[in-house]
Amino acid sequence: MSLNFFDQFMSPTLLGVPLIAVAMMFPWTLLPTPTNRWLNNRTLTLQNWFIGRFTNQLLQPLNTGGHKWAMILMSLNLLGLLPYTFTPTTQLSLNMGLAIPFWLATVLLGLRNQPTAALGHLLPEGTPTLLIPILIIIETISLLIRPFALGVRLTANLTAGHLLMQLIATAAFVLLPMMPTVALLTTLVLFLLTLLEIAVAMIQAYVFVLLLSLYLQENV
């Protein structure tokens, strides 16, 4: 039994070896490997069609290259909602490790391809002369804050949802022998919250990749 509510966010270890890498690679094993049997297997054909339609509708604003990153983040977020599982994307270090390199790549790409336009983002057009130093500092700070906002947003939303689910589940378990009716209502609230967390897990993965795509479009 957990000693406190935050134990669920501790990285699992086996013989002192962190298993966060295994937890991150697990969603890739769920992807089916294309074979010739797909041509005669109606179930796999239907599954492939559904995944394709779902991906196109949900990830339509994203470019094709961002689909796989959105799907892997979505898989990590959704698998973390299962009982007795670990959610790697609740770790701020992991999210910052994803956000900072991708953001830095967009900035360096803009400086290499169109340095004048990339630096021009730091100074809006028509700025009064007296405000130029202040606005350059403000725009530079807002540019540097972007990766931190990406990582903290993903971590905070998932962590808050997991904590709230654990609190409600604990309340339902404690109330069951004393007030079964209240415990049943609490379980219903937990079920509705789980549906909400599924939506949040999908939306947060989508927002993470969408913002990176927008940052890339600014510098291309």
UniProtKB/Swiss-Prot annotation:
InterPro entries linked: ATP_synth_F0_asu (IPR000568), ATP_synth_F0_asu_AS (IPR023011), ATP_synth_F0_asu_bact/mt (IPR045083), F0_ATP_A_sf (IPR035908)
CDD domains documented for this protein: ATP-synt_Fo_a_6
Pfam family for this entry, one: ATP-synt_A
Keyword hit for Heme: no
A GO MF label: proton channel activity
One GO cellular component term noted in the UniProt record for this chain: proton-transporting ATP synthase complex
Family stated for the protein in its record: Belongs to the ATPase A chain family.
Function recorded in the entry: Subunit a, of the mitochondrial membrane ATP synthase complex (F(1)F(0) ATP synthase or Complex V) that produces ATP from ADP in the presence of a proton gradient across the membrane which is generated by electron transport complexes of the respiratory chain. ATP synthase complex consist of a soluble F(1) head domain - the catalytic core - and a membrane F(1) domain - the membrane proton channel. These two domains are linked by a central stalk rotating inside the F(1) region and a stationary peripheral stalk.
Name assigned to this protein: ATP synthase F(0) complex subunit a
Lineage: Eukaryota, Metazoa, Chordata, Craniata, Vertebrata
